[in-house]
Amino acid sequence: DVVMTQTPASVSEPVGGTVTIKCQASQSIYSNLAWYQZKPGQPPKLLIYKASTLESGVPSRFKGSGSGTDFTLTISDLECADAATYFCQGSBYTGTVFGGGTEVVVKG
């Protein structure tokens, strides 16, 4: 089964800053990678699918890139509302697996 390794576990940046979250798959998953945002008491929100396709209504400040085994989520022009935990989700023929999550703290 594919294993998704997500880094860092936590990151803190000021309002207006940029956060980069990385996700590495143990084997190629092509572009079968999604990113989710989760806030307490709310269901996970899909941000990006197929590695780089922005879900409808998601601001372009969120950018996904990568293919194969290495993927990145970049959040630019950080806003207080971006404070959340972010997860990658990789899929292959065995099913889907989530990364361990990254807590984003926005200062300001």
From Swiss-Prot:
Residues 24-34 are annotated as: Complementarity-determining-1. This is Ig kappa chain V region BS-5. Residues 1-23 are annotated as: Framework-1. It comes from Oryctolagus cuniculus. Pfam families: V-set. PANTHER family: IMMUNOGLOBULIN LIGHT CHAIN. Residues 57-88 are annotated as: Framework-3. Residues 35-49 are annotated as: Framework-2. The keyword Manganese does not apply. Disulfide bonds join C23-C88, C80-G108.
